[in-house]
Swiss-Prot record:
GO terms for cellular component: cytosolic large ribosomal subunit. It holds the Pfam family Ribosomal_L12. One of its GO terms (molecular function) is mRNA binding. Belongs to the bacterial ribosomal protein bL12 family. InterPro entries: Ribosomal_bL12, Ribosomal_bL12_C, Ribosomal_bL12_C/ClpS-like, Ribosomal_bL12_oligo, Ribosomal_bL12_oligo_N_sf. It comes from Synechococcus sp. (strain RCC307). Homodimer. Part of the ribosomal stalk of the 50S ribosomal subunit. Forms a multimeric L10(L12)X complex, where L10 forms an elongated spine to which 2 to 4 L12 dimers bind in a sequential fashion. Binds GTP-bound translation factors. GO terms for biological process: translation. This is Large ribosomal subunit protein bL12. The keyword Ribosomal protein applies. Forms part of the ribosomal stalk which helps the ribosome interact with GTP-bound translation factors. Is thus essential for accurate translation. NCBIfam families: L12. Keywords: Ribonucleoprotein, Ribosomal protein.
Length: 130
């Protein structure tokens, strides 16, 4: 790799999850692309990479994000948060939210699951990770 790409890679390694999420959104807007398909591949690859590390402690690496309930007044905000977390269309996300308690996403890496939980809870939903 070139020195420039090495420098960019090192800068990316220092980003927090929130900063990385903001960067992805900015890249999507700037270049008119969607990271939804590639994000799923990264999420699915991460647990395998962590398991291959040979860690002695058995820490759960994949989680199911479960929408338990939501404040009726915050339904639209919760719907938007679920759409953002899952990449679903409006009708599919609405059906998912209205079926609560229901899994929003299954087999998600720990960090991504915690981010989804935080976003949905900030919107007014009650979420558990299993």
């Amino acid at each position: 790799m070139s020195a420039k790409t090495d420098e960019i890679l090192e800068s990316l390694k220092t980003l927090s999850l929130l900063e990385a999420s903001e960067l992805v959104k900015q890249i999507e807007e700037a270049f008119g692309v969607s990271a939804a398909a590639s994000a799923g591949a990264v999420v699915m690859a991460a647990p395998g990479a962590a398991a291959g590390g040979g860690e002695a402690a058995e820490e759960k690496t994949e989680f199911d994000v479960i929408l338990e309930s939501f404040d009726a007044a915050a339904k639209i905000k919760v719907l938007k948060a679920v759409r953002e977390a899952t990449g679903l269309g409006l009708a599919d996300a609405k059906g998912l939210v209205e079926k609560a308690p229901t899994p929003v996403k299954e087999g998600v890496a720990k960090a991504a699951a915690e981010d989804m939980k935080k976003a949905i809870e900030e919107a007014g939903g009650k979420v558990t990770l299993k």
